[in-house]
Curated annotation (Swiss-Prot):
Chain residues that bind Ca(2+): 77, 79, 87
Entry EC number(s): 3.4.21.4
PANTHER family found in the cross-reference section: RIKEN CDNA 2210010C04 GENE (PTHR24264:SF15), TRYPSIN-RELATED (PTHR24264)
Source organism (scientific name): Gallus gallus
Full protein name: Trypsin I-P38
Keywords for this protein: Calcium, Digestion, Disulfide bond, Hydrolase, Metal-binding, Protease, Secreted, Serine protease, Signal, Zymogen
SMART domains per the UniProt record, alphabetical: Tryp_SPc
Length: 248
């Protein structure tokens, strides 16, 4: 799940939910088109607990705070409550967290999952390219997931939800979370609130101009004014990703 905490307050978990009239999807998003995010996966342990991104036929990228030693990866998933024949379920053979992951600060919140067999790629299951450069502030990106659709209360969707949101500047990000943003994090969303990723979206993709630039990591609450979502900055990890994949 997305960490809805200010992770450096002496280890105390705090979240400040608010009401919002526009809470309908992700929070404030919409139901994705069926093949809008063929790279989106659902991480399962008897239930959906996090998202992830298929970056090769046998590797998935997600958040380290989603770690479990054994994971069932569902690909081609769209409606969690129904099957349309496009789904593939493949168990993990390896789950590799970044060695520098810090559970308190959520720095280096990244992990790789090796599938026990290669996925069959098609229009519903496909890979997303890694970034060739870091994304610039102001770029609109696509966020997707099956996380909570309410900033106050809980309403989890069956159908994959999408949200278009802008990348914020590093100064906007640091101002929202003073002293807590590292160079491995980016903020994406709306400072006025109302639209955001939420619990259950963790590890799920942020795709900008066709490249995987981030995935859901943490924040204070969901869709709260002044507190945009914080995402792992994938462009900083391309070398780590490629090295880890080639050596495993």
């Amino acid at each position: 799940m997305k960490f809805l905490v200010l992770v450096a307050f002496l280890g105390v978990a705090v979240a400040f939910p608010i009401s919002d009239e526009d809470d309908d999807k992700i929070v404030g998003g919409y139901s994705c088109a069926r093949s809008a995010a063929p790279y989106q996966v659902s991480l399962n342990s008897g239930y959906h607990f996090c998202g992830g991104s298929l970056i090769s036929s046998q590797w998935v990228l997600s958040a380290a705070h989603c770690y479990k030693s054994s994971i069932q990866v569902k690909l081609g998933e769209y409606n969690l409550a129904a099957q349309d024949g496009s789904e593939q379920t493949i168990s993990s053979s390896k789950v590799i967290r970044h060695s520098g992951y810090n559970a308190n600060t959520l720095n280096n919140d990244i992990m790789l999952i090796k599938l026990s067999k290669a996925a069959t790629l098609n229009s519903y299951v496909n890979t997303v390219p890694l970034p060739t450069s870091c994304v610039t502030a102001g770029t609109t990106c696509l966020i997707s997931g099956w996380g909570n659709t309410l900033s106050s209360g809980s309403l989890y969707p069956d159908v994959l939800q999408c949200l278009n949101a802008p990348v914020l500047s590093s100064s906007q990000c640091s101002s929202a979370y003073p002293g807590r943003i590292t160079s491995n994090m980016i903020c994406i969303g709306y400072l006025n609130g109302g639209k955001d990723s939420c619990q259950g979206d963790s590890g799920g993709p942020v795709v900008c101009n066709g490249q995987l630039q981030g995935f859901v990591s943490w924040g204070i609450g969901c869709a709260q004014k002044g507190y945009p979502g914080v995402y792992t900055k994938v462009c900083n990890y391309v070398s780590w990703i490629k090295t880890t994949m080639s050596s495993n």
